[in-house]
Every structure is written in structure tokens, then in C-alpha cells.
Amino acid sequence: MGCDVHDPSWQCQWGVPTIIVAWITCAALGIWCLAGSSADVSSGPGIAAVVGCSVFMIFLCAYLIRYREFFKDSVIDLLTCRWVRYCSCSCKCSCKCISGPCSRCCSACYKETMIYDMVQYGHRRRPGHGDDPDRVICEIVESPPVSAPTVFVPPPSEESHQPVIPPQPPTPTSEPKPKKGRAKDKPKGRPKNKPPCEPTVSSQPPSQPTAMPGGPPDASPPAMPQMPPGVAEAVQAAVQAAMAAALQQQQQHQTGT
């Protein structure tokens, strides 16, 4: 898209007259030098004509040799103030002027299009126009701030609405282990000659594992009541003490007879 600004030639208020006067003076001196070659060269006007013609020819040859394409542009854009320097803005407002036209040209684009950007000036190489160190290209290097869309961020309180699972108590898996250890310890203390009442006593330990539920801890309680762990241990200790007392009495009875 273009920008609705006037021709930037008006911004070089003194550039156009200076360039026109310089070219007309050089051309007049050149013509005077060629036309007055038969006159006395040692006179003041003759010396000025020779110097002016030499400067004009040097200027012309230098630009024809060094900046061929740029010289064509300078000749074409002579009367429109497009000379020596090149300025380009993002709104495609361009101008070629002498004495810092980029600041004026880009400022016109800047004010017209209301682009709140930063303008950077620097020497650049324009393809097809030779390596001209005097060409200054100014361009928009920072885009205007774009209003970001409002994104709804949920407050942290909503994230904490997730159900919190309370820690479950540990399952009583450690109870059968001491029972197994005690069952292993019983054969060690028992003598080889068992009394006739031992089968009735040994029938209690296998009945205890059947009372323990085999399901998870949150399952429904069984129909038969369970004995607390302390009561079961006390019963086992009493049974063992009774068995030991019976064995001692039997041994004393045997030794007495």
C-alpha cells in the first residue's frame, strides 16, 4: 500500500536550486571554454572557463565510469530532487535528495500513516545501481505494538477443585507374619511324646486364619466376629503355659513312680 503524501521533491528546498545552478554553471563554463578557445586563455574569464570545463568533465567522467546506472538515474531525476541519496520507507514513500533526505522522507511517511515505529538509517547496496556508499536507505526496523488478545487465565483456586484422596491406613498384612513365626516355634518346644490332650489344643491355631478376611480392608466385615490380636496372643501364651505345666506334672509323676 502506498502513502498519501506529496511529491518529496518539495522537501529539498535548497537541494533543487543548488543542483540546477551547479549543472547550468558547469555547462555554461564548458560551452564558454569550447567557444572561446581562440580567445586569450590567460585572461580571467578564460581561466575560469578552463577550470569549470575541467571540473565538469571530471565530474561527468567519474560518474560515467564509477556509477553508470546511478548516473542515468541522477540525470532522469535531476528536476525531481532525486539525487545522490535514496530513501525508502515501509509505506513505499521514496525520495532521492541531497543533504539528508531520508529523515525528511521517512518522517513524512511516518506522520502520514501514523506508524509508531523506529526508523533506522544506514548505507545499503541497491542491486542494479552500483556500489554507492552515498546511498542511504532508511527502513522500518520495529513494528508497532500489537494489542495482544485477552486470554482468560483461570485463577489458582479453580485448579485446586480436584478431589483430594485422603491417605488410606495401612492394611493389616503384618499380623499373619508373627503367627507364622509362632507356629514354627511350637514344634521346637514340643517333646516327642505328646500328651493325649494335645490334639484338642492344636486345633485352635488353624481356626484363626479362617477368621481373618481375605479381601481388601474396605470390604464388608465377615459374619463371624474376629478376635483382637492381643487376645489371640494371650490365649496362645496361656495354652503354651498349660502345656508346659502338664508336661512338668507328667515328668514329676514318672520320676515319683
Curated annotation (Swiss-Prot):
Transmembrane helix keyword on record: yes
Domain of life: Viruses
UniProt keyword list: Host Golgi apparatus, Host membrane, Membrane, Transmembrane, Transmembrane helix
Predominant place of localization: host cell
Bilayer-spanning residue ranges: 14-34, 45-65
Biased composition range(s): Pro residues: 164-175, 214-228
Cellular component terms (Gene Ontology): host cell Golgi membrane; membrane
Region (Disordered): 149-232
Membrane-topology annotation of the record: Multi-pass membrane protein
UniProt subcellular location: Host Golgi apparatus membrane
Biased composition (Basic residues): 179-193
Name of the protein this chain belongs to: Protein UL133
